[in-house]
Amino acid sequence: MNRYKYILSIFLVKAGIKLIIIMMISSSLYSQENSHNLNFMFTNNGYGFGYESEKFLKENLSIGADLRFYDIRSDEYPVYDPFVNQYKIIGEKNITMLPLYLRLNYYPFQGKIANNFEPYLLFALGPMLSIDGDENIRSFSKRWSNAETQISPGGSIGIGINFNTSTSNTLAFGLGYDYLKVEEPIHDKKDYGGAFLYLKYKINRE
């Protein structure tokens, strides 16, 4: 990717982050409760983690930012080499995806069942930054400084369940589907989406 496209990609990501922050601040004027969560993601293409802020607009509806980091590992697998008596990785790739989503959580049964059990639906939409590092470059800094990047639209839908405790901490788990398609193929592949499982830990509630 040439320098112009790289600068444009960075600009779009920064603009997306600013837009999410502005929407979060404006929504906080009407929010009943704020929370900050850590997410741990397990996907069919790898794994990841993320940060999620949640602000309730109504008792059963929240809005917030959903920032994720995906380490793509779908085509990698270990192979035993008897000559050196060690395992080596075949098909190693250095692909990172950074979705920057605006997220809505809808709690259809809020106030209708036990308060410590909260099913919800999630909808997330926003830009995704894809970074393809050159695995043939051994230097970590050079590998990522020369990486190709591109911006694509992304999104998620899913279901989850919050398990509230007597403290402010909450554990949750859920299932969902990611839409992660890139315009230009990365290692001959465009679609890195699919099903995912996530675990969520609420680190702070205001």
Question: How should each PLM-predicted stretch be described?
Answer:
Residues 29-70, 200-206:
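Short glycine/proline- and aromatic-enriched beta-strand/turn motifs that initiate or cap beta-hairpins
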Residues 35-39, 86-92, 141-147, 182-189:
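Extracellular loop and loop/strand-boundary signature of outer-membrane beta-barrel proteins
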Residues 36-40, 63-67, 102-104, 119-125, ...:
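Membrane-embedded beta-strand positions of outer-membrane beta-barrel proteins
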Residues 34, 45-49, 59, 94-100, ...:
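Residues that define the transmembrane beta-barrel architecture of outer-membrane proteins
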Residues 35, 45-47, 72-74, 111, ...:
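Sequence/structural signature of outer-membrane beta-barrel proteins
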Residues 101, 105, 191-206:
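Outer-membrane beta-barrel "beta-signal"
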